[in-house]
C-alpha cells in the first residue's frame, strides 16, 4: 500500500467537519473492504443519493451503546453468528413529516438525521425500516478494529454527535471494491482515504482505555514479579486487569509476552477440562527464565462469555457438544475476546517489540492490529490429558490453534496434570 495515497487522520477529520464523505479501509487480514463514512449530523439527501449510487452497499448508521439504549435499538437477533460480530440492531425508519415509504433518499436522510439528533427518542422511529443501525463497542477502535467503531470515533473527533453513516463500497460488477478500485474512487471524487490502522494509532495517543491503579512486588512460586493493576476507563463493567512484569523494557530488544485471559476454573482450581492453568504457569516460568517479560492477565473469563455462561457451556459439552458448538448454542461466537486493552497495557509498559507466547494465530492478528510488532511466536506446549484432549482437538481443528494433540493420554493422570500447574 503506497503511503502517498493514504491521507492523514487529521485531514480526514477536517473533511468530516466540513460535511464531506471520506473512505475508510481496514486490514486485508480482516474484511479488506472500504466504506464511505460521514458524520451523521452532516448528512444531506444529496449525499445519501450519491452513496446509494456509487457505493451500492448497505446503508448503516453506527451509534454508541448508550445511544442504542436511549432509542431502544434492540439487537437484530439474539444469537449473533456474524463472521465479524457486526452488531446490527433492528432496522428503523423515521416517523416524521414528509417521510413516506422510508426508502427514498430524502426518507433515509431523515432517518439518519434523527438517529443523530440528541432530542430524538424511541417513539420517533418505526421498526423495521430501511436504515440499519449498528452498535459500536465502548472504547471505539481501541476495543474493536471495525468500520462501525471507526465511524463513531471519527464523528466524535470531527466535533459531531458520535453517530456515523457508513456504507460498504462495491465494484461495478457487484464484488467488493478492494484497494486499487478504492484509490480510483478517491481520485475521481476527490475524497480523503484513510486506514483503520492509522486511526487506531491516532487514538492510542489520545485516548485511554485503562489507567494504572496500583503497583506492588509479588513473589510467586514461579519467580518474583512487579504486579501492576489497571482500572478500565471505558468499560461499563469497570473490570480491572493485571500485568506481571519482569525486568526492564527500555531497550529495543524484543520482550517475551503472554496475553492470558482469566480462567477461574483452570487458573485457580486446576480444572482438567482445559489447559489454561498449565499455560499460565508455563508462561510465568518462561518469563522468569528469560529474565525479562510480561504477562497480561485480562478479565475475559470463558473467552469473553463470563463464568456463568462458561459453566453452562460445560453442561452442554457433557451432552456431546464441543466447545465451539456449546458457545453457539448459548448464542455466542466461539471467541469474544478483544485485545485492545491488552495492547494499551503493553504500550503503557513501553513494550515495542515482542516474542508472543501463544498457540492462537488470531491473537497475533488481534495485537498487530493495534500497531504492536510481533517478531516471533513462541508456542506453549502443554501435554493433553484424557479429559481435555477433545477440547484441545476442537481448538486446533475449528479455531485454528497451533496445538500438538498427539500424546498417550492414558499415561497422563490427574496427578500428573496437577503437578504441571
Swiss-Prot record:
Q: Where is this region: DHBP synthase?
A: 1-205
Annotated GTP binding sites = 258-262, 279, 301-303, 323, 358, 363
Q: Which Gene3D superfamilies match?
A: DHBP synthase, GTP cyclohydrolase II
Q: Name one GO cellular component term.
A: cytosol
Site residues, Essential for DHBP synthase activity: 130, 168
What does the record give as the reaction this protein catalyses?
Answer: D-ribulose 5-phosphate = (2S)-2-hydroxy-3-oxobutyl phosphate + formate + H(+); GTP + 4 H2O = 2,5-diamino-6-hydroxy-4-(5-phosphoribosylamino)-pyrimidine + formate + 2 phosphate + 3 H(+)
Taken from the record, one Pfam family name reads: GTP_cyclohydro2
CDD domains per the UniProt record, alphabetical: GTP_cyclohydro2
Query: In the Enzyme Commission scheme, what number(s) does this protein have?
Result: 4.1.99.12, 3.5.4.25
Q: Which residues bind Zn(2+)?
A: 263, 274, 276
The UniProt note on the cofactor reads as follows: Binds 2 divalent metal cations per subunit. Magnesium or manganese.
Which GO annotations describe the biological process of this protein? riboflavin biosynthetic process
Q: Which GO terms describe its molecular function?
A: 3,4-dihydroxy-2-butanone-4-phosphate synthase activity; GTP binding; GTP cyclohydrolase II activity; magnesium ion binding; manganese ion binding; zinc ion binding
Query: Hey, which pathway is this one from?
Result: Cofactor biosynthesis; riboflavin biosynthesis; 2-hydroxy-3-oxobutyl phosphate from D-ribulose 5-phosphate: step 1/1; Cofactor biosynthesis; riboflavin biosynthesis; 5-amino-6-(D-ribitylamino)uracil from GTP: step 1/4
Which residues are noted in the entry as D-ribulose 5-phosphate-binding? 30-31, 35, 144-148, 168
Entry keyword set: GTP-binding, Hydrolase, Lyase, Magnesium, Manganese, Metal-binding, Multifunctional enzyme, Nucleotide-binding, Riboflavin biosynthesis, Zinc
Q: What are the start and end residues of every segment in region (GTP cyclohydrolase II)?
A: 206-421
Co-factor(s): Mg(2+); Mn(2+); Zn(2+)
Q: Which residues bind Mg(2+) 2?
A: 31, 147
Entries under NCBIfam families matching the protein: PRK00393.1, PRK09311.1, ribA, ribB
Name the family the entry cites.
Answer: In the N-terminal section; belongs to the DHBP synthase family. In the C-terminal section; belongs to the GTP cyclohydrolase II family.
Function, as annotated: Catalyzes the conversion of D-ribulose 5-phosphate to formate and 3,4-dihydroxy-2-butanone 4-phosphate. Catalyzes the conversion of GTP to 2,5-diamino-6-ribosylamino-4(3H)-pyrimidinone 5'-phosphate (DARP), formate and pyrophosphate.
What is the name attached to this protein's record? Riboflavin biosynthesis protein RibBA
**Source organism per UniProt:** Prosthecochloris aestuarii (strain DSM 271 / SK 413)
